[in-house]
Amino acid sequence: MLSLACFFSFLLMVKSSPLTFQERMLLKALGLNTRPNPIAPGPVPKSLRDIFEKGINKDNPCMMEGFGVPGNIVRSYRDQGPVAAMEEPQESLCLKKFLFFDLSAVENKEQLTLGQLEIKFKHNSYYGQQFHLRLYRTLQLSLKGMRESKMNRKLLVSQSFRLLHKSLYFNLTKVAKDWKTPEKNMGLLLEIYASSKLAGDNRSFAVCEPIQSFIYTSLLTVSLDPSSCKTPRAKRSTHSSPPTPSNICKKRRLYIDFKDVGWQNWVIAPRGYMANYCYGECPYPLTEMLRGTNHAVLQTLVHSVEPESTPLPCCAPTKLSPISMLYYDNNDNVVLRHYEDMVVDECGCK
């Protein structure tokens, strides 16, 4: 199978052409059905930035250490639900809002290991008033014009809090796992009450205003794609290789700038990376430095006897390493994903 680094090398040559078969294959490997074109992208969560900047643990690339769960894909979904109309005034009720997160981007092969809801308030939040939060899972949608029934929802969280300069987080892993099946995703209902009774419209507005103008709610998921997890290989000795002639098979430097392949609009970070490539001859006899396979050694031997009927082995990657990419997907969600086989570390004859 060709490495993703090889696909990028090809894209540099065809960057001015329409979406190619090779680019479609690469996008598919990245979990995308077409090249994203963010319309109204949301902010990049600090947790995803922190994981990206920390880098991959090469000894355990399929563990999200920041969350303490297995995984190699992190997604952040923005809430798509509306503020609910209050059917009748309810004493001390500040906010009633439906929450909906579209998890259709999670593939069937992925194992969802974490679902975490974040509710973030503005930084000028009011400190003194205590509030009470109730979070329900919607089990069945009410028909238009009909009064909402409490039988159609299940209480998940009930807790009191004060507005501080920080977010509220709730573990919704079990619910998020169910939402991998779209028919089971009816969303959530969020209600926030002032703990004390509100007297008068002015006091009601003063107390509830920080709640009614919270910045956003988002859902973060961590999932594991087992097909992208590789067992770490034993480290080779670190002695440096002697200089080789320029025409001999070896690693060559290649920097991939995502702007050169037309991906700068949706790839958040990195802006580019050192992908490298393999190029050169595999002459007879193969030396240990060329890291030839047993098949390649025999092939060069046969080539030395019958050069017209048997070609020389090819110069190809023998060791590849992963990178992390932070980008917007086709639904404007922020995704952090670890990708195998993105950097050529060593070359040999195959």
Curated annotation (Swiss-Prot):
Do you know which InterPro entries this protein is assigned to?
Cystine-knot_cytokine, TGF-b_C, TGF-b_propeptide, TGF-beta-rel, TGFb_CS
Kindly list every residue the record annotates as glycosylated. N171, N202
Q: What does the similarity note say?
A: Belongs to the TGF-beta family.
Which GO terms of the molecular function aspect are on file?
cytokine activity; growth factor activity; morphogen activity; protein homodimerization activity
Q: Which residues form the propeptide?
A: 17-236
A biological process term (GO) from this entry: mesoderm formation
What function does the entry list?
Required for posterior mesoderm formation during embryogenesis. Acts indirectly to suppress head formation by altering mesodermal patterning. Also involved in the establishment of left-right axis asymmetry, acting upstream of nodal/nr-1. Can exert long-range effects in the embryo.
Task: Name the domain of life.
Answer: Eukaryota
Q: How does it assemble?
A: Homodimer; disulfide-linked. Also forms heterodimers with other TGF-beta family members including nodal2/nr-2 and bmp4.
Location of this chain's protein in the cell = Secreted
* Protein name in the entry: Derriere protein
Which Cys pairs are S-S linked? C249-C315, C278-C347, C282-C349
Grouped into one coarse class, the protein's main location is secreted
Query: Which region is the signal sequence?
Result: 1-16
User: What's an example GO cellular component term for this entry?
Assistant: extracellular space
The UniProt keywords, alphabetically, are: Cleavage on pair of basic residues, Cytokine, Developmental protein, Disulfide bond, Glycoprotein, Growth factor, Secreted, Signal
Species name for this entry? Xenopus tropicalis (Western clawed frog)
Gene3D superfamilies to which the protein is assigned, alphabetical = 2.60.120.970, Cystine-knot cytokines (2.10.90.10)
The gene coding this protein: derriere
Q: Name one Pfam family in it.
A: TGF_beta
